[in-house]
A protein has these predicted regions:
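N-terminal amphipathic/basic-hydrophobic helices that include classical n-h-c signal peptides
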Residues: 1-21
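Short secondary-structure boundary segments
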Residues: 7, 62, 70-108, 196-199
């Protein structure tokens, strides 16, 4: 009985401290990264795909720390999925360069939430910004679920609508009528993530691979917009 009481008191204290820590967290999260050499291309700058992974990692850290991330959601058969991503870059971090990703949510609706990113070096020089739209789905039915209800309104406590992000609100990605098929890609093991579908950054990498390397000797990516319409899975053809 004495041992049980001690364990109960310990758990109670842990929960209280955890809630206190969450309540003291800022609305904007800041996370440090390094442009490691094996994540850089032949120009000695970070691969766009790896920068995208850093943005998603920052989003994951931010949401998990505040109680509405994948760690909690998976326990109730839910998860986050990326619906839209827009990134504008004035510069890409160079090899061995330290950089910071800031992230925050400026609004939340029933089925979608808007997440922002700011990428700087350690001295505050701004490399670029990002805007994204996320949905929450049931991992069994794959259908959207009520974000506010699932997060017990916790997400609403961390909204930051006043922090500047100069990127314009995402609009519908328009496609020309005369587009021609450039390549078909069969999805394989390394494309599939923890949600059992093609990872959102893998689409970006596949698109960038459509351009010859000579293109990247002359130009660099300054802006991209991508909309995720439906899930793809292993052995699907893109």
């Amino acid at each position: 009985m004495q041992i049980f009481i001690r364990i109960s008191l310990f758990l109670q204290e842990y929960i209280i401290n955890r809630i206190s820590d969450m309540n003291n967290l800022p609305k904007i999260g800041k996370y440090n990264f390094v442009a490691e050499p094996f994540h850089c291309d032949f120009t000695k700058h970070l691969f766009i795909g790896h920068l995208g992974n850093n943005l998603l990692n920052a989003a994951d850290f931010h949401s998990n720390d505040r109680g509405y991330g994948v760690n909690y959601l998976n326990s109730v058969n839910k998860t986050w999925v990326l619906s839209r991503l827009s990134v504008e870059l004035d510069k890409i971090p160079a090899i061995y360069e330290d950089f910071v990703v800031e992230t925050w949510i400026d609004s939340v609706m029933r089925y979608f939430t808007n997440r922002n990113f700011k990428i700087t070096n350690k001295d505050g020089y701004v490399y670029g910004y990002g805007k994204s739209i996320w949905a929450m789905i049931d991992t069994t039915t794959r259908q959207p679920v009520d974000i506010l209800k699932t997060s017990n309104e916790t997400i609403s406590e961390y909204l930051e609508a006043d922090y500047a992000n100069p990127i314009k609100k995402s609009s519908r990605v328009k496609l020309d009528d005369d587009l021609k098929l450039q390549q078909s890609i069969l999805t394989t093991y390394s494309d599939i993530d923890i949600n059992g579908h093609v990872n959102s950054i893998k689409y970006i990498e596949h698109i960038l691979d459509l351009f010859p390397i000579e293109y990247y000797k002359k130009y660099r990516i300054k802006k991209f917009d991508i909309a995720y319409i439906m899930e793809s899975h292993n052995n699907d053809k893109l």
